[in-house]
């Protein structure tokens, strides 16, 4: 299930575009997630009171969390699959403290793909989308394996 060097290059090329403006990318990813899957909002005490897109756009906490999410994901992607050290604490907190099911990781992955398609159509063609999907699937599978080790059935 690993990615080729060429696929990792496609992933990291488009991720460079994300890093040029992490706050707006992160905010848009979370807003898409929450609008498309309102049940995910319930896992976030800081955001669950936000009902409208305007309220979400105005929330500094939501923007900060978007930065946190995409910064962590960027660190993982840059490891090109050698991300054990990064995955372990992330899985620990998401399994034991936040109780985020793997399904929600799938949903946020979909939101990430949609935001990249929307913001970077010229840099995110079919090959790049396929590579990013594989990279996000690798991340989710490794998170799920850690969840299992921790006894979390998420």
Swiss-Prot record:
**Binding residues annotated for nitrite, in chain numbering:** 65
Q: Which residues bind heme b?
A: 94
List every position bearing Phosphothreonine: 68
Q: Which GO terms describe its biological process?
A: removal of superoxide radicals
Per its record, the protein catalyses: Fe(III)-heme b-[protein] + nitric oxide + H2O = Fe(II)-heme b-[protein] + nitrite + 2 H(+); H2O2 + AH2 = A + 2 H2O
Report the PANTHER family cross-referenced here: MYOGLOBIN
What name has this protein been given in UniProt?
Answer: Myoglobin
């Amino acid at each position: 299930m690993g990615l080729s060097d060429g696929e990792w290059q496609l992933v990291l090329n488009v991720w460079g575009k994300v890093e040029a403006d992490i706050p707006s990318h992160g905010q848009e990813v979370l807003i898409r997630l929450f609008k498309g899957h309102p049940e995910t909002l319930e896992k976030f005490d800081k955001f669950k009171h936000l009902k409208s897109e305007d309220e979400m756009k105005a929330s500094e906490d939501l923007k900060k969390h978007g930065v946190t999410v995409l910064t962590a994901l960027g660190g993982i992607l840059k490891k090109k699959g050698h991300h054990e050290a990064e995955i372990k604490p992330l899985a620990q907190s998401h399994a034991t403290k936040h109780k985020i099911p793997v399904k929600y990781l799938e949903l946020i992955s979909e939101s990430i793909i949609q935001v990249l398609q929307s913001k970077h159509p010229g840099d995110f063609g079919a090959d790049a989308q396929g590579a990013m999907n594989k990279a996000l699937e690798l991340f989710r599978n490794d998170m799920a394996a850690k969840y299992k080790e921790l006894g979390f059935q998420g």
